[in-house]
A protein has these predicted regions:
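Structural detector for internal amphipathic alpha-helices that build alpha-solenoid repeat scaffolds
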Residues: 1-5, 27-38, 60-73, 96-108
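Amphipathic alpha-helical scaffolding segments comprising HEAT/armadillo-like alpha-solenoid repeats
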Residues: 5-17, 38-50, 74-89, 111-112
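Membrane-interacting alpha-helical segments
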Residues: 14-27, 57, 61
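Short inter-helical turns and helix N-cap capping residues of alpha-solenoid HEAT/ARM repeat scaffolds
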Residues: 21-22, 54-55, 90-95
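Leucine-rich repeat
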Residues: 41-57, 61, 69-70
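A structural signal for the main folded, soluble domain(s) of proteins
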Residues: 51-55, 66-67, 77, 102
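Short, amphipathic alpha-helical segments
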Residues: 79, 92-99
Length: 112
């Protein structure tokens, strides 16, 4: 993965990207939503859906974006997110980024 600058997108642009079936557009929408979308629950739910995507780059973006939500918004539904991330941690294609995301959550949201 190489760094890509994250740009704000409107909700309509996010929905268009997420429903595009284009892994690059989906990734871009997930990153933008996790950084800039004010409705963190909406973004969280989309990330949880895309954790199961067939493209490993999309799964990577979904996992990392959950950490970004914790970092930028200081909120997540931990009862939904933590079990999903722990399950995703078994995926060798994204296990390292799942670990990074779990670290971001632990640093930014009180988990106990």
């Amino acid at each position: 993965m190489k760094y890509e600058e994250v740009h704000p997108q409107s909700r309509a642009q996010l929905v268009e990207g997420l429903t595009s079936n284009d892994p690059e557009k989906i990734r871009s929408a997930l990153y933008s939503a996790s950084w800039y979308e004010s409705d963190w629950r909406w973004t969280q739910e989309n990330c949880l859906v895309f954790l199961g995507h067939p493209d490993p780059n999309v799964r990577w973006a979904a996992a990392l974006s959950l950490g970004y939500i914790a970092h930028f918004h200081k909120h997540l539904d931990l009862d939904r997110v933590l079990p999903a991330l722990h399950e995703a941690h078994a995926d060798p294609a994204i296990s390292s980024t799942v670990g990074d995301s779990l670290d971001m959550i632990a640093q930014n949201i009180k988990t106990q």
